[in-house]
C-alpha cells in the first residue's frame, strides 16, 4: 500500500506501475462547498482522461462518469449522490478486467466499462472544491520508488491542471511512457 497524505488540490500524481485487475485507488476527503462547486477525480493517460468521475452539486447532486479519448468525450453516465457541504467521503475505484467498480462511502455506485486500456493509465488528477486527506494505492507490486517522483510531477503540473480543459499530462511533463 502507498499513501499520499494531504495532497494539494488541484494535483496530478504519476502512477508508477500499470493499472491491472485487482488494483484499487481510494480517495478520502471532504466536500468544501455545496450547491455552487464541483470536484473531479480523473485517471489520466497522455492527453486522454481515461476515467472522469465528477461530483456535481447543481440542484440534482449527480456524479458524471465519462472518458475523453483523442479529444472526444464519450457518452456520459449520470448517477445521483448524497454528498453535501463538509461531508466526508471515501471514493474507491476498483479495477476489474473489463470495468471499474466505483463506490462512495462503501456503497457501490456504478460499474463503468473500460474505454481505454487500463495499462496506459499514467496518473491521477484531482481538482475542484474539495479537501483531500489521502490517496491510497493498493494491489500494486511496488517495485519502484513512488515517493521521490510524486513531488517532481506534482510541482510541474498542479498549477495548470485546473485551468485548462485537457490537463497537462504526465507524459508531456516527464517525457516517458508507461506501456
UniProtKB/Swiss-Prot annotation:
Keyword Flavoprotein in annotation: no
Gene3D superfamilies: 2.60.120.200
Galectin domain sequence ranges: 11-138
InterPro entries: ConA-like_dom_sf (IPR013320), Galectin-like (IPR044156), Galectin_CRD (IPR001079)
Keyword Isomerase: no
Domain of life, per lineage: Eukaryota
An annotated Gene Ontology molecular function: carbohydrate binding
Keyword terms of this UniProt record: Lectin
PANTHER family listed in its UniProt record: GALAPTIN LEC-7-RELATED (PTHR11346:SF49), GALECTIN (PTHR11346)
Designated name of the protein: Probable galaptin lec-7
Organism: Caenorhabditis elegans
Amino acid at each position: 500500500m502507498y499513501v499520499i497524505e494531504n495532497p494539494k488540490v488541484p494535483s496530478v500524481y504519476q502512477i508508477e506501475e500499470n493499472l491491472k485487475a485487482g488494483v484499487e485507488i481510494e480517495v478520502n476527503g471532504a466536500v468544501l462547498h455545496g450547491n455552487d462547486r464541483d470536484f473531479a477525480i480523473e485517471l489520466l493517460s497522455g492527453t486522454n482522461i481515461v476515467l472522469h468521475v465528477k461530483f456535481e452539486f447543481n440542484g440534482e447532486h449527480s456524479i458524471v462518469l465519462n472518458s475523453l479519448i483523442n479529444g472526444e468525450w464519450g457518452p456520459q453516465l449520470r448517477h445521483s449522490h448524497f454528498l453535501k457541504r463538509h461531508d466526508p467521503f471515501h471514493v474507491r475505484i476498483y479495477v476489474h478486467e473489463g470495468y471499474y467498480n466505483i463506490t462512495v462511502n462503501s456503497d457501490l455506485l456504478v460499474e463503468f466499462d473500460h474505454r481505454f486500456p487500463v495499462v496506459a493509465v499514467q496518473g491521477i488528477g484531482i481538482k475542484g472544491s474539495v479537501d483531500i486527506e489521502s490517496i491510497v494505492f493498493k494491489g500494486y507490486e511496488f517495485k519502484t520508488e513512488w515517493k521521490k517522483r510524486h513531488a517532481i510531477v506534482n510541482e510541474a503540473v498542479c498549477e495548470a491542471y485546473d485551468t485548462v480543459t485537457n490537463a497537462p499530462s504526465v507524459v508531456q511533463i516527464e517525457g516517458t511512457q508507461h506501456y
